[in-house]
């Protein structure tokens, strides 16, 4: 019989730990872990039970403490071999005892906290998982602090294991807060994970780049362009060390995508600033162009605008201008780019060393500098636009339509947004229309390529977007309609918009889209409710398009009647859906009710004997 000693127990546990870390072939994936279990159960626990009576009281207490540790390790081994219920029960059973000796066995206690926490998180027991991770984090910090205070010379193996557990805790926290939709805390722990991995210099480069690019996107959402830039530049450096060529190419394409979005979101921000300026300019133009008398299309008479009404209107415009100025100031306070304090004094990823960081940030491999300028006019907007477009096009070389349909379409829609942001800074009507047509050219060819059986949702998005673009073009032509030819061009844009809105709406009907799957009436209503926001907007926009048609009375009347029917159908639809859905669309309901009341009067007015002859053009 072997005389049981603490050193003997430690030796068996060390052998078991070594076995548990072995990576076995796919045919026998858990061979080493089962050997570790056998070592702990058959050899160690058996020896302890046989020698228990020969030990003094202190030895017995020490052995009991180690039995708790052995049980916790067994629980983790069973979890690792996918016997999760058994392993979880063992870990939970020994957790209370383990917490009582946590100062003696901090690493084992932390590891058990984490094992239970990640299972709870995977089962959506987020609060339980969160509390265990907090306990784990506190114990990690206490252990590090204790080491520093007492200047303990711990084994390197202990320090490495503690750092590894700290890294794992950061990673689990990042996952947890991601699932809880707390992007701020998730990003905080993601950053800590990335930095700890760089410090340890032992990490999967592919996963590191993925997480770093996710962090970059978070910083873009927070308008922190300086930190976003640091994330993708360091990812670009790390990416070069990915050994697998396919993985490296995919990661490089994702880096280009984030860089494209870097410029896209920057232009988006200044588009919003310009939009506030534009609102004020439009109000001023309207004020200057207002006539004192306005024609009422129903009564056919004149209505005077009193001085008090003008004063109220001016006060309203002044108030709006002041509100917009405050909004602009707040927005400009939020944005961060080209700030020395973030790029020099507080850079991310200092673990790489200042010399290497300087090389990465200031001497990157890209042909042109990755910099930003304040967007004030069309030339500066175009500069940002071209840089974003450049990186979108580079990413599309990897994310081709053949093989990456969803991602390719997503990139095209991002490019459409890019064109839209540029258009805000364009003052020439012809160039504005040209930009809109470029947007259509990007996505219209996809309608011939996509199979509705698999990509019906994408096809609907394309229908809706093209309809929206033609509607925007019609608004530009509407401002310059002075003769028959211009009115005809204006109407053609409206008719194109109607065509695509109808294609979108009809796609919810069985058999309307070629090769689309058959659906029942119940399935149709379900799909409408799933897309209710965009569906109701499409119907509303279609009704407005019909209402805005210009030309001879016969044509106008025909489209006014269609418009009226659509407004009424929207009311019927909103009355038929559940209350929680209809309550979100009270504004649309009110507008449709107003139109259902006003349009019959307009139709009657145009049809009455007072109207000009049938060949008369109506452009009101």
From Swiss-Prot:
Residues 30-64, 133-169 form a coiled coil. Its main location: cytoplasm. GO terms for biological process: mitochondrion transport along microtubule. Pfam families: KBP_C. It comes from the Eukaryota. GO terms for cellular component: cytoskeleton; mitochondrion. The keyword Ubl conjugation does not apply. Keywords: Coiled coil, Cytoplasm, Cytoskeleton. It is found in: Cytoplasm, Cytoskeleton. The keyword Coiled coil applies. Activator of KIF1B plus-end-directed microtubule motor activity. Required for organization of axonal microtubules, and axonal outgrowth and maintenance during peripheral and central nervous system development. Belongs to the KIF-binding protein family. This is KIF-binding protein. It comes from Dictyostelium discoideum (Social amoeba).
């Amino acid at each position: 019989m072997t005389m049981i000693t603490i050193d003997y127990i430690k030796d068996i546990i060390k052998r078991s730990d070594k076995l548990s870390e072995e990576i076995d072939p796919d045919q026998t994936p858990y061979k080493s872990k089962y050997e570790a279990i056998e070592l702990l159960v058959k050899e160690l626990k058996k020896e302890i039970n046989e020698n228990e009576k020969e030990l003094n009281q202190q030895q017995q207490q020490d052995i009991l403490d180690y039995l708790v540790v052995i049980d916790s390790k067994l629980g983790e081994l069973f979890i690792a071999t996918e016997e999760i219920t058994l392993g979880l029960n063992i870990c939970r059973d020994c957790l209370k005892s383990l917490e009582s000796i946590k100062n003696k066995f901090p690493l084992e206690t932390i590891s058990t906290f984490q094992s239970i926490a990640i299972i709870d998180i995977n089962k959506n027991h987020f609060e339980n998982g969160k509390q265990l991770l907090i306990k784990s984090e506190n114990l990690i910090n206490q252990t590090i602090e204790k080491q520093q205070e007492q200047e303990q010379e711990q084994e390197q193996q202990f320090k490495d294991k503690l750092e590894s557990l700290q890294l794992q805790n950061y990673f689990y926290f990042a996952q947890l807060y991601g699932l809880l939709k707390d992007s701020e805390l998730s990003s905080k722990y993601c950053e800590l994970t990335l930095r700890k991995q760089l410090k340890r210099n032992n990490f999967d480069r592919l996963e590191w780049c993925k997480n770093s690019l996710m962090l970059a996107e978070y910083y873009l959402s927070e308008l922190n362009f300086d930190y976003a830039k640091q994330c993708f530049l360091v990812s670009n450096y790390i990416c070069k060390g990915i050994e697998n060529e396919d993985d490296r190419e995919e990661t490089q394409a994702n880096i280009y995508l984030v860089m494209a979005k870097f410029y896209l979101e920057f232009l988006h921000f200044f588009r919003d600033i310009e939009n506030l300026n534009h609102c004020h300019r439009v109000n001023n133009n309207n004020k200057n162009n207002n006539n004192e008398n306005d024609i009422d299309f129903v009564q056919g008479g004149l209505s005077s605008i009193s001085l008090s009404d003008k004063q109220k209107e001016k006060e309203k415009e002044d108030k709006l201008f002041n509100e917009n100025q405050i909004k602009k100031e707040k927005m400009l306070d939020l944005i961060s780019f080209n700030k020395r304090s973030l790029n020099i004094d507080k850079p991310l990823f200092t673990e790489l060393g200042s010399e290497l960081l300087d090389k990465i940030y200031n001497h990157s491999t890209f042909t042109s500098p990755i910099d930003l300028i304040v967007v004030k006019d069309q030339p500066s907007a175009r500069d940002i636009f071209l840089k974003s477009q450049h990186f979108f096009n580079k990413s599309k070389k990897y994310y081709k339509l053949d093989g990456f349909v969803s991602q390719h379409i997503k990139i095209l829609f991002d490019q459409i947004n890019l064109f839209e942001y540029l258009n805000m800074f364009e003052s020439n009507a012809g160039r504005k229309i040209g930009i809109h047509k470029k947007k259509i050219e990007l996505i219209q060819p996809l309608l011939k390529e996509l199979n509705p059986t698999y990509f019906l949702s994408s096809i609907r998005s394309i229908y809706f977007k093209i309809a929206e673009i033609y509607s925007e073009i019609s608004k530009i032509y509407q401002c310059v309609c002075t003769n028959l030819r211009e009115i005809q061009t204006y109407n053609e844009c409206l008719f194109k918009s109607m065509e695509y809105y109808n294609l979108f709406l009809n796609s919810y009907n069985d058999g309307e889209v070629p090769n689309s799957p058959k659906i029942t009436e119940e399935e149709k209503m379900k799909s409408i409710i799933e897309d209710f926001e965009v569906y109701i907007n499409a119907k509303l926009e279609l009704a407005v398009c019909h209402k805005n048609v210009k030309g001879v009375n016969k044509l106008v009347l025909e489209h006014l009647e269609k418009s009226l029917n659509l407004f009424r159908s929207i009311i019927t639809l909103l009355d038929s859906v559940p209350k929680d859905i209809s309550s979100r669309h009270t504004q649309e309901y009110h507008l449709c009710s107003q139109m259902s009341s006003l349009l019959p009067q307009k139709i009657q007015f145009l049809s009455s004997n007072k109207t000009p002859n049938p060949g008369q053009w109506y452009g009101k």
